[in-house]
Every structure is written in structure tokens, then in C-alpha cells.
């Protein structure tokens, strides 16, 4: 009898050892962060960002290849570091630019898969001064409030956040001087952001304002 129980116990141990860790996590109620959904994006460390001379060009190819071996689509969570002074044109997308190629940043043409930013924080971006053209254009995964109040942004170039249809609010920094690359393109910055309920300047005396300039 003891011999039989011992055999059963050994079999159970062997079976458990082959259960994937992810399956155990799901059964125990823990969330699995694998980047496969917008609700569970992979947090990008600073070394996962392609940064040169204070300019953020995109996501570093080497880091991306390591976290996306299946070369599918992944969702990312990005916190802009304090040392970044500029987000380059298309800097938060996987679209192709010659600057990205030059600075080892991922594009959809690299055969490494694709990505979309599902969470974006500017809380630590105290050195940020410029957000380039089409930086996050067409992103529908980003939700909630785009809060730039901790930054020193003075320029947001044309179409930077156009088509971010699920943003509900924007808080602009007091340092902002230029919205759009020129006066005729100012409206393009948040064009197509259909979910927006308000745009405010940080420190506004009227927190119920739909749009207020300093």
C-alpha cells in the first residue's frame, strides 16, 4: 500500500513539474504581464529605450528582440526618463524613419515584430522640452489623461497626439509656447482625439475649464 502511494506521489510531482509557470500564475489569480494585451503591457526599462544625446528615438532593437522572441505584436508601458529632452518625430511608434535606423530603434520593417504603447507616463520627464511630429499619432490603446504638468515642454509639434481617440483629458505644462509646428497646424496636435473632455494648463485656477490658455 505504501509503495503504491509513493508511486502516485512521484507521478504527481512529475506532472506538476511540467505545468508552465504562466498557467500556475493564472490559476492563483496573479496577472501575467507578457505584453500580449493592452491591459498587461511590458514595462520598458531605460535601457530598452533608444536614447542618444537626450533625444528619444524609439525602442531599442536589442531589448525588443529579447522580450519579443515570437516576433508578434506586443503592448508596452513607457515612462519617459528625466534625461530625455526631446521625443523625436514618430518616437513612440514603430513606423520607419531614417533617424530610427541610425539610432538602432525598432521599426515595423525590421522583422522583429511590432508594438503599440498602452501606457505612457511623463511623471519623471522633468527635462523634456520638445515633443516631435506624429510622436504618438494614431494610438487608440492609450486611455485616460495625458499629463504633461511635470515636464518643461515648450514645443509640441504637429500631429503629435492626433488620432489618440481614447484620451479623455490633457494637462499642458505652463512652459508651453508652441502648439503645432506653425500657427496653421496648431489644431492638428489633438485632431481626432474624439474622447477628449478637456484640455487644461497645469495650475489653472479653473479646474472645470474645458480649454483655458495661460
PLM region spans:
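Structural signature of tandem-repeat unit edges
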Residues: 40, 44-52, 70-86, 97-130, ...
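Bacterial N-terminal signal peptides
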Residues: 9-19
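Extracellular, surface-exposed repeat architectures
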Residues: 57-63, 160, 200, 207
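Sec-dependent signal peptide cleavage junction
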Residues: 18-40
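Bacterial N-terminal signal peptides that target proteins for export
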Residues: 1-9
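A short glycine-rich, aromatic-capped structural motif
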Residues: 60, 65-69, 79, 88-89
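Short beta-strand/loop segment at the start of cytosolic alpha/beta domains
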Residues: 33-66
Amino acid at each position: 500500500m505504501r509503495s503504491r502511494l509513493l508511486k502516485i506521489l512521484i507521478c504527481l510531482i512529475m506532472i506538476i513539474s511540467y505545468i508552465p509557470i504562466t498557467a500556475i500564475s493564472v490559476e492563483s489569480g496573479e496577472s501575467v504581464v507578457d505584453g500580449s494585451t493592452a491591459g498587461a503591457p511590458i514595462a520598458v526599462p531605460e535601457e530598452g529605450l533608444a536614447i542618444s544625446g537626450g533625444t528619444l528615438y524609439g525602442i531599442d532593437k536589442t531589448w525588443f528582440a529579447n522580450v519579443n522572441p515570437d516576433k508578434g505584436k506586443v503592448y508596452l508601458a513607457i515612462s519617459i526618463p528625466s534625461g530625455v529632452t526631446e521625443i523625436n518625430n514618430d518616437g513612440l511608434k514603430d513606423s520607419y524613419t531614417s533617424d530610427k535606423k541610425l539610432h538602432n530603434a525598432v521599426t515595423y520593417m525590421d522583422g522583429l515584430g511590432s508594438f503599440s504603447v498602452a501606457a505612457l507616463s511623463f511623471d519623471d520627464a522633468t527635462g523634456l522640452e520638445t515633443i516631435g511630429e506624429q510622436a504618438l499619432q494614431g494610438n487608440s490603446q492609450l486611455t485616460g489623461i495625458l499629463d504633461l504638468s511635470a515636464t518643461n515642454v515648450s514645443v509640441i509639434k504637429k500631429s503629435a497626439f492626433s488620432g489618440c481617440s481614447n484620451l479623455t483629458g490633457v494637462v499642458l505644462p505652463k512652459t508651453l509656447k508652441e502648439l503645432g509646428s506653425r500657427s496653421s497646424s496648431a489644431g492638428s496636435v489633438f485632431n481626432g482625439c474624439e474622447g477628449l473632455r478637456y484640455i487644461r494648463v497645469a495650475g489653472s485656477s479653473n479646474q472645470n475649464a474645458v480649454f483655458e490658455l495661460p
